[in-house]
């Protein structure tokens, strides 16, 4: 990615690593209710559907209808169920997949400043897969907390640590890594589309002198990246969410989950929750990339001031 100006000094790998994780956490704080609504819509119709405190399954309709229903039935706090696991995920996940992207891209280009589309795609796939290897348990927890109804006494998990213990006890160590295959696939796709699209749009805007390396450029690039990513990654995202939230033995594999979805509900099932996915991913990208660019600038400026003698 083209660096943000901080006295024309490029940000270090450490600055990118810390900045990416911090920016992703800030983006999650703003967009978590949209992500929760997306998860509820994606799993609607599963065997363990959300229930309205014993009065039958809750029906979710649309993004804001889902949010409204959750607030009415479960209270406002339900929109942030799983936030702790979500923030744990972003600090370990985004730091790797976004923060190390430029370093891995330079590795593939052998230090050259001219990166082709192939090296960008390879860098995106690599850091996306690496991030899943590090952060998968936190992703499993986040999805399960978002899927469970907060009202009533039938909650699967009561706290983040309780969830880690319960999953490890009932499902074994493998339970914490459930859905790793589809998640690696999803995040390789997401990372390639998201980072490479942002990279290319930003490069094009700067090289054509349509915009300068500032907030409007970052906003436009991030919004475009979010839209492209949602279209390409939605099918894998739905399979990942359903499989990670499924009861033990419900699906034999992620592929079995995908086949069951296709045979029972048709191709449209793979784009279930598309609008909340786009609203969430589009807004998340805007907040994250804008914050990330600002953090890189601020951290490099602070670093320069620290090393500048008075």
Swiss-Prot record:
Residues 277-299 are annotated as: Purine nucleotide binding. Pfam families: Mito_carr (PF00153). The chain crosses the membrane at residues 11-32, 79-101, 121-137, 182-198, 216-235, 270-292. It is found in: Mitochondrion inner membrane. One of its GO terms (biological process) is adaptive thermogenesis. InterPro entries: Mit_carrier, Mito_Metabolite_Transporter, Mitochondrial_sb/sol_carrier, Mt_carrier_dom_sf. Disulfide bonds: none annotated. One of its GO terms (molecular function) is oxidative phosphorylation uncoupler activity. It is a multi-pass membrane protein. Belongs to the mitochondrial carrier (TC 2.A.29) family. This is Dicarboxylate carrier UCP2. GO terms for cellular component: mitochondrial inner membrane. The keyword Magnesium does not apply. Its main location: mitochondrion. It catalyses: L-aspartate(out) + phosphate(in) + H(+)(in) = L-aspartate(in) + phosphate(out) + H(+)(out); oxaloacetate(out) + phosphate(in) + H(+)(in) = oxaloacetate(in) + phosphate(out) + H(+)(out); (S)-malate(out) + phosphate(in) + H(+)(in) = (S)-malate(in) + phosphate(out) + H(+)(out); malonate(out) + phosphate(in) + H(+)(in) = malonate(in) + phosphate(out) + H(+)(out). Solcar repeats lie at residues 11-107, 115-204, 213-298. Homotetramer. Adopts an asymmetrical dimer of dimers functional form.
């Amino acid at each position: 990615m083209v660096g943000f100006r901080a006295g024309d000094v490029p940000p270090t790998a450490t600055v990118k690593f810390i900045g990416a994780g911090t920016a992703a956490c800030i983006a999650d704080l703003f967009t978590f209710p949209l992500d929760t609504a997306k998860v509820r819509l994606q799993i609607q119709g599963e065997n363990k559907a959300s229930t309205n405190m014993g009065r039958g399954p809750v029906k979710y309709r649309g993004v804001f209808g889902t949010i409204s229903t959750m607030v009415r039935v479960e209270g406002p706090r339900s929109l942030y169920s799983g936030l702790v696991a979500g923030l744990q995920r972003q600090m370990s996940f985004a730091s790797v997949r976004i923060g190390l992207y430029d370093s891995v891209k330079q590795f593939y280009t052998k230090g050259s400043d001219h990166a082709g589309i192939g090296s960008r795609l390879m860098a995106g796939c690599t850091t996306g897969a690496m991030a899943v290897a590090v952060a998968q348990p936190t992703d499993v927890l986040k999805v399960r907390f978002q899927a469970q109804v907060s009202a009533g006494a039938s909650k699967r998990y009561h706290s983040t640590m309780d969830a880690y213990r319960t999953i490890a006890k009932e499902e074994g160590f493998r339970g914490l890594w459930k859905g790793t295959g589809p998640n690696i696939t999803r995040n390789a796709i997401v990372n390639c589309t998201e980072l490479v699209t942002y990279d290319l749009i930003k490069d094009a805007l700067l090289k054509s002198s349509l915009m300068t390396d500032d907030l409007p450029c970052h906003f436009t690039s991030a919004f475009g990246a979010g839209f492209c990513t949602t279209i390409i990654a939605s099918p894998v995202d739905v399979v990942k969410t359903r499989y990670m939230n499924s009861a033990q033995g419900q699906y034999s594999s992620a592929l079995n989950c995908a086949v069951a979805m296709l045979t029972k509900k048709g191709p449209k099932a793979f784009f279930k929750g598309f609008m909340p996915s786009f609203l969430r991913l589009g807004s998340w990208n805007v907040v994250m990339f804008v914050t990330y660019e600002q953090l890189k600038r601020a951290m490099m400026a602070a670093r320069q001031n620290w090393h500048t003698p008075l």
